[in-house]
């Protein structure tokens, strides 16, 4: 408990956002619209979920608040507990997925994407275009989507005959 208190007092902005996300869970239950972020790129949408910047939604099916004040939602395997910190994690992962999805679309304009692993994209490129392909792919991965102008993105890349050798 001491570690948690020290972390929260040392990182008040994060702790405040987690608390805000608990109010977002209440808004979802009440079917009210609430902004997730100051730029209002993400908002709760009544009867739908949290709208993400690219138009997709993050949903918590059958979200309820228990008598003890906890939140839970239905999954295929039962009910899962959810809370502000977990919503923050889900939002970060969802936005990262939106970004890498747009990056893959841009890369696909020139090179075939054959695999993604978390935040990594693997492509098959002609050997004689390897350096040019690397530059193009890095440029695509460093370019934020239109809805995230100014977001600092960076990447590292490697080239090899097999994915395991990168």
Which residues does each predicted region cover?
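Conserved catalytic core of nucleotide polymerization and phosphodiester-bond processing enzymes
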Residues: 1-166
């Amino acid at each position: 408990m001491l570690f948690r208190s020290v972390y929260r007092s040392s990182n008040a902005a994060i702790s405040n956002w987690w608390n805000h996300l608990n109010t977002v869970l209440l808004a979802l239950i009440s079917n009210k619209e609430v902004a997730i972020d100051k730029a209002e790129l993400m908002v709760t949408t009544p009867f739908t979920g949290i709208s993400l910047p690219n138009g997709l939604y993050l949903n918590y099916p059958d979200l309820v608040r228990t008598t003890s004040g906890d939140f839970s939602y239905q999954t295929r395997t039962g009910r899962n507990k959810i809370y502000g910190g977990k919503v923050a994690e889900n939002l970060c992962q969802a936005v990262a997925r939106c970004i890498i999805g747009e990056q893959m679309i841009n890369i696909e304009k020139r090179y075939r994407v054959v695999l993604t692993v978390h935040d990594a994209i693997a492509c098959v490129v002609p050997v004689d275009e390897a350096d040019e392909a690397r530059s193009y792919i890095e440029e695509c991965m460093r370019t934020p989507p239109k809805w995230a102008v100014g977001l600092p993105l960076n990447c590292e890349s490697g080239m090899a005959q097999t994915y395991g050798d990168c």
